Swiss-Prot record:
It holds the Pfam family Complex1_49kDa. GO terms for cellular component: chloroplast thylakoid membrane. It comes from Liriodendron tulipifera (Tuliptree). GO terms for biological process: photosynthesis, light reaction. The gene is ndhH. This is NAD(P)H-quinone oxidoreductase subunit H, chloroplastic.
Amino acid sequence: MTVPDIRKDFMIVNMGPHHPSMHGVLRLIVTLDGEDVIDCEPVLGYLHRGMEKIAENRTIIQYLPYVTRWDYLATMFTEAITVNAPEQLGNIQVPKRASYIRVIMLELSRIASHLLWLGPFMADIGAQTPFFYIFRERELLYDLFEAATGMRMMHNYFRIGGVAADLPHGWIDKCLDFCDYSLTGVVEYQKLITRNPIFLERVEGVGIIGGEEAINWGLSGPMLRASGIQWDLRKIDHYECYDEFDWEVQWQKEGDSLARYLVRISEMAESIKIIQQVLEGIPGGPYENLEVRRFDKARDSEWNDFEYRFISKKPSPTFELSKQELYVRVEAPKGELGIFLIGDNSVFPWRWKIRPPGFINLQILPQLVKRMKLADIMTILGSIDIIMGEVDR
């Protein structure tokens, strides 16, 4: 009598590279034993455009339109880091009004990013209603961006030494109205989602990351703060003028998908609180450092000709990056967004290294999904909040 062979073969499934809920093209090669995940291998690079190499062949001003294509849902942060690096390299002072305007734009961009994380994340786990609700606040936000910068997305608003244009007449009142309205929206989301038993069943205890583990993996942003680590670069690095306002670092200690949701939803309310304080105390004065508007160093340069009489509206085409190196970082919605810049007494950076939060946060995904169910992959991946534009660069 022959004994039947009861050996099981694992099933290998491709998720992607196009998944309907993904911002970009990520491919997951998942090994399954029935419904249980045995292994998961992310395949990156489908959206690689050589952003670091492009930077080495452009001046900072020429490169600014490119950076909004990294994380295209939080473009103000990529612009901020791009101008902060040469500002610190050249020791350029930013006027107080410009710094206040920057904080407003950064926090509005943080809210926009979290809103467009919340909708697809809820759709991933089966709740379609919030996906449509978030577009109300998002449309109002984009109207504010359009009025101030001329663009709904890809704003190209930050400049070395300030911002491109002052806030238009009546914009501050509109922004205050938006803050009052969106606070009620955040409360509505919390009522709709946070205590929903089906939602809690899907996210509670799923994808747990301990505090020490989060530090060892190099996680940042809500991924780190949801694991009990109170680390926010706005408090740590004291950049722009965040120290002048009263706000708290939002954190949770559970480290699961629910904790990451709670951190982001409370960060939206905290950002509104910061914006309200900035709008009430915004000072007068210039919106950019006029000393940055330099002409070409060469005598009788073509840049000084009659045809170029308006060139002083822009930072000089010969804005040199001194021969030194530095690392600059900001607290983006997804985590620590950093630039390692090496100058070479040239108008082009010698090296422009991008440290995207999404790329590093994504590395923990295979560990989180092991021994989980197949359906939990989208919950965990959604709670990480990645944009493939900045992951692949």
